[in-house]
Amino acid sequence: MKKLSFFLIVFMVNNLSAQDLSQYKKEKIVFETDTLNYRILKPLNYNPSKQYPVHLFLHGAGERGNDNKSQLVHGAKLFLKKENREQFNSWVIFPQAPKNDWWGYKDPYKFAYNVKESNAMSLVIKFMDEFIKREDVNQNKVYVSGLSMGGMGTFVILNLRPDMFAAATPICGDGDPNLVNNYAKKIPIWIFHGSDDSAVSPNNSLKMAKAIIDAGGSPKITFYENVGHDSWNNAFNEKDFLEWIHSKSKKTKQ
C-alpha cells in the first residue's frame, strides 16, 4: 500500500507539473514566409483594462527545436509559482529558436554591427515591437532574461532595441563589449555566471560587466563559486530575482 501511495504521489506531482506548463499557450510568430514558435503565459486574473509588464525569456542552445515545448525546461516554472504570479503578475513569453538558429547573429560568436542578426532574433524583435503596442501592456516595464545562448541573445537584443527594455538579466552569457554604449547607461542589468562554467567562460560576463561600467553603467554582478554552466538554477533561487526585475521601470533611472 505504501509503495502504491508513493507512485500515486509521484504521478500526481508529475501531472500537476505538466498541467502547470500547459498554462503557457502555444502560439506562432508569422512574418511573411517565416515562422517561429513561442509560448505565452497570460497574466493571472487577466483584466483587459489593466496594463501588465512583459517578460521575454530566451532559452539556451539545448532547448532549440520545433516542438514548442523544450524552451520551457528552464525558467518557466519560476513564473508559475503562486506567489510570483500574484506579486509579479505579467505577460511571460518564451520563444523557441529552430535547431539550426541562434539568439544572436548568424554566426553565434560574432557580435559585430556588420553581421546581420539571426532569423530567430529578427522574428522575436518584430513580434516584440508589435506586442508591446497592445493597450494591456505597460511599455515602461518590459524585461528580458536569457541563459547561455539566451544570455548572449539578451546582450544582442539590448543593443538592437535599447529603448524597449526596463531591465535585463543575462545568465552565463557573452556579448561584444564594443556594443554596450547603446544601453549601458539606460538599462539596469544583473549579470549571473558560475565560476566553474566550462561551456561559456565566466570571463565573458566579467568582460561585459567591465565594458558596461566603463561606458557609464552600473551592472549588478553575481558569480557563484563552484557552480558550472547551470548557474540559472542559482539565479532563479535568488530571493529578489523577480523583485529586482519588477522594481525597474523606464520611468525611473538605474
What are these regions (language model features)?
Residues 61-121:
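Active-site machinery of serine-nucleophile hydrolases
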Residues 1-22:
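Bacterial Sec-dependent N-terminal signal peptides
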